[in-house]
A protein has these predicted regions:
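Sec-dependent N-terminal signal peptides
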Residues: 2-13
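Nuclease and nuclease-like effector domains acting on nucleic acids or nucleotide cofactors
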Residues: 14-77, 88-151
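Short active-site segment of divalent metal-dependent hydrolases/proteases
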Residues: 85
Length: 151
């Protein structure tokens, strides 16, 4: 009987140790990510002030994003975030936008911002290709965070 119980525990452990963080990721159907194609990082994202020039999401688009996700706009709780950030060559298209929480734990907009900054530094220093950074953050930003930042 004890062996059977130990076997059950051994088989069950992977299921309990796997972190389910899907609720912290955007819905891929609504927000697959939308990178700008053919950017030369040295002439765009690595130039100081690039994101200020590139940022152009209208209030009506922001409202549509919140409607799409059936979320009430609350500026103190959510931002309309670029899945592929502007600093990684993401577009302002609605396919690249989602409401990301500031307050959820452990994964939130502040953690994603930390990842975006790290990936931009890596792209601009030649440690990673822009396309790879775009793909990794669009595919699963939390996995990319764990890979490049840890924690």
């Amino acid at each position: 009987m004890i062996r059977l119980f130990l076997l059950f525990l051994l088989v069950s452990l992977p299921a309990y140790s796997q972190e389910d963080y899907s609720k912290f990721l955007p819905n891929k159907e609504f927000t697959p990510g939308d990178p700008l194609i053919g950017l030369n990082p040295a002439e765009t994202i690595c130039v100081s002030g690039y994101t200020k020039k590139a940022r152009a999401v209208s209030e009506s688009t922001k409202r549509k994003v919140f409607e799409l996700y059936n979320t009430t706009p609350q500026q103190d709780r959510y931002e309309v975030d670029h899945l592929i950030s502007l600093e990684l060559g993401g577009s302002n298209d609605i396919r690249n936008l989602w409401p990301q929480s500031y307050t959820t734990q452990p994964w939130n907009a502040y953690k994603k911002d930390k990842l975006e900054n790290k990936l931009k530094r890596m792209v601009c220093s030649g440690q990673i290709q822009l396309e790879q950074a775009q793909q990794e953050i669009a595919n699963d930003w939390i996995a990319a965070y764990k890979k490049y930042i840890g924690e």
